[in-house]
Amino acid sequence: MSFCKLVSFVLILHLLNSCLISCSSNDLSQIPKNFLSLAKREDFFDWMVGIRRRIHENPELGYEEVETSKLVKTELDKMGVSYKNPVAVTGVIGYVGTGHAPFVALRADMDALPIQEMVEWEHKSKIPGKMHACGHDAHTTMLLGAAKLLKEHQEELQGTVILVFQPAEEGGAGAKKIVEAGVLENVGAIFGLHVSNLLGLGQLSSREGLLMAGSGRFKATISGKGGHAALPQFAIDPVLAASNVILSLQHLVSREADPLDSQVVTVATFEGSDAFNVIPDSVTIGGTFRALLPKSFEQLKQRIVQVITTQASVNMCNATVDFLEDETPPFPPTVNNKTLHLFYKNVSVDMLGIENYVETLPVMVSEDFAFYQQAIPGHFSFVGMQNKSHSPMANPHSPFFEVNEELLPYGASLLASLATRYLLDSSSSPNKDEL
């Protein structure tokens, strides 16, 4: 590159950086495009890829995210971003902007899953039996990317952005602990996102209202009378009883639920004897149940108890059911605020065009982001990463799950754009001035 061209490039980049927000006060639609351009810079992209790979190599389960939190704090320190830690055991809460109202929050989850990674690549998990199989490494990276974009334009922010690096989304209800910690008081809105292997790279998706199901867990112990497998007549077989229970539980959805009222019951664990010739005294089964509507969720919960105890009794066994709520509360449905969804859609279309926005149907997965939405207006969305020219990607929670790192600039710039535009829209409204 010639000296003149180099000078011209530097001047253009300086102008883009210096007027990213101030110029956009006259043309808000340019903010997402400008942030995306900055996030796609080679140096910025390489920085995000490096962070994501470091997190991926060292996965930590819920409330164990010690090293992940250290990485987050180190990067925030480099940016000059202030933060609180620990919050909700291992969480980190960062602050960018004026320190005064209005306040808007951005959230990323940090925890991994107890899964052995089966993808062979240079940055495979170094921790046996643990893997980032749901993209939380990418979520954390994208929020750090958003923090960097926002910090570079902090003087132009019309309020304060709260960066929520949350622990324990995978069953630990870390969001609930964040809310209970009181760090989101006076926050006007919170935004979160999730990677999607079903959407094309550069596509964004969400919907107004009901987005994801409420979910709960159950564990049932079915007790009979143990004995020799060759002499079943002298035993009361809890394995057979549990098998009948599992089949009967499937009738709750196929024969009792309205087909237009989506529900799911899945038995995912079955534990009995370790010996091939022993009928055990008891069997333990466990699983998840989900529903989009709170009323249906409660009805399903009641029927699970009835079916398990009654079917056990028919087979001359006893049964107890535990919904494990002392360990983890059930997750409410994820419901997007109507006003925030319209706002999100406008920002998404401004960034990538209407052709890259997809209005999704409700899905039966669940998210503890719903706990934020119970406390303050919130919006959750999906960022696509599927390369249409390649074979379909593995689903989340698979040992073969992979993240297309090309999506990182899209998520980082979307989060930064949502926060910036929200503060600009809210700066003229009355707000409480302290967190």
From Swiss-Prot:
Its EC number is 3.5.1.-. Mn(2+) 2 binds at C134, H136, H194. CDD domains: M20_IAA_Hyd. One of its GO terms (biological process) is auxin metabolic process. The keyword Cell inner membrane does not apply. Keywords: Endoplasmic reticulum, Hydrolase, Manganese, Metal-binding, Signal. One of its GO terms (cellular component) is nucleus. GO terms for molecular function: IAA-amino acid conjugate hydrolase activity; metal ion binding. Residues 1-25 form the signal peptide. Mn(2+) 1 binds at C134, E170, H397. A motif (Prevents secretion from ER) lies at residues 432-435. PROSITE patterns: ER_TARGET. It holds the Pfam family M20_dimer. It is found in: Endoplasmic reticulum lumen. Hydrolyzes certain amino acid conjugates of the plant growth regulator indole-3-acetic acid (IAA). NCBIfam families: amidohydrolases. Belongs to the peptidase M20 family. This is IAA-amino acid hydrolase ILR1-like 5. The gene is ILL5.
